Amino acid sequence: SVALVACATAFVVTLAGCGSDSKTSSASSSSTTTSSVAQPLASSTTETAPAEPASACPMTPPANGGAPEWTLRGTTGSVAVTGSTATAAPVVTVTAPFSVTETQVHTLQPGDGPVVASTATVTVCYMGVNGRDGSVFDSSYERGEPVDFPLNGVVPGFQKAIAGQKVGSTVAVAMASADGYPDGEPRAGIAPGDSLVFAIKSLGAA
């Protein structure tokens, strides 16, 4: 339902998050974890899903895992990100624990639309991964539907990732705790100090 889809965005949109008592951890091998999609967070009615086709956020990762478009060595650990395509979800591979002290944004594929303002309301597909253990804490790709929200209502790191990019861009951000949830978000399994990684596809802005 729209309400259930909407709730998943509340975590990114608000500093408090909506969360649930469970989170989805991806399969892991040794200290390296590859993440694709997660289950949505608990219900909220603060956001609505836009009337976009489900294919806008492909649900299935590439069969071969995809070639990384960005690799980053952190203060600890490392991350490799393959952005989404028209037919495949993104892949985020974390060598845990991954952490950064400064937020870093990388454009995986530039778009050709207008530049996104810092106060815009955006339509995006996204996947969020916890650098501490490689678990996916939220993903609109799992639901197969994009979401929209105002950039002035999101955590700072998410705004830094999207504002200034062109619509149509595929972006990755390694987010320092200070730009995410410095005090943690227990309902999403985020502890104080956790660095977060997002793979994002910008579909529209108004």
Which residues does each PLM region occupy?
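Cross-family detector of peptidyl-prolyl cis-trans isomerase
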Residues: 1-206
